[in-house]
């Protein structure tokens, strides 16, 4: 469903106010008629969604429409396809069907997130915790300083934010199930 993708906010304000029936938070900048604009740039780098250009076509996942660049009507039930780590070269007609990639065991982003989480849980300073995460957001052009945010004052607030950042940054890297188990 939508819940993992609601973590991709650009303004820092959560998209939803509630948990049962989502109530849109006006401060988030979310627009139901254009749900992919003004979002964390990592969303577009992670998933393909309706209307996005990819390869030699436009993704169209609407019911009864062509939903992939090859024109097959095998729509994804979620409305999303994985984009992260999928090179567009595989759409080339001359492509052999193989694409070998080295598996990344650990990324610097994970090290920063692990450090921020450990620092937060150990009662580290607010500035140190948030400054550990800042390079991840700077890298994608979200340069608003986390230390300027007023909603990350408590350890619990920062814990939730770090968990959201892990969901976004480490999407499709086999961390989510282990993170959820560790957090519960």
Regions found by a protein language model. Give the residues of each.
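Acidic/polar-rich alpha-helix caps and helix-coil junctions
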Residues: 1-184
């Amino acid at each position: 469903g939508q819940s993992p993708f609601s973590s991709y906010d650009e303004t820092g304000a959560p998209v939803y106010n509630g948990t049962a029936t989502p109530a849109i938070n006006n401060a988030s900048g979310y627009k139901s008629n254009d749900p992919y604009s003004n979002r964390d740039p990592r969303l577009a780098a992670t998933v393909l969604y309706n209307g996005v250009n990819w390869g030699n076509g436009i993704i169209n996942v609407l019911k009864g429409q062509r939903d992939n660049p090859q024109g097959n009507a095998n729509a994804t039930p979620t409305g999303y396809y994985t984009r992260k780590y999928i090179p567009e070269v595989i759409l080339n007609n001359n492509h052999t069907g193989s694409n070998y990639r080295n598996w990344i065991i650990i990324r610097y982003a994970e090290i920063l997130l692990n450090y921020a989480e450990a620092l937060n849980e150990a009662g580290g300073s607010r500035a140190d915790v948030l400054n550990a995460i800042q390079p991840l957001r700077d890298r994608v052009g979200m340069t608003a300083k986390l230390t300027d945010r007023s909603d990350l004052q408590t350890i619990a607030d920062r814990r939730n934010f770090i968990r959201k950042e892990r969901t976004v940054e480490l999407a499709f890297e086999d961390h989510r199930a282990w993170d959820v188990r560790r957090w519960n």
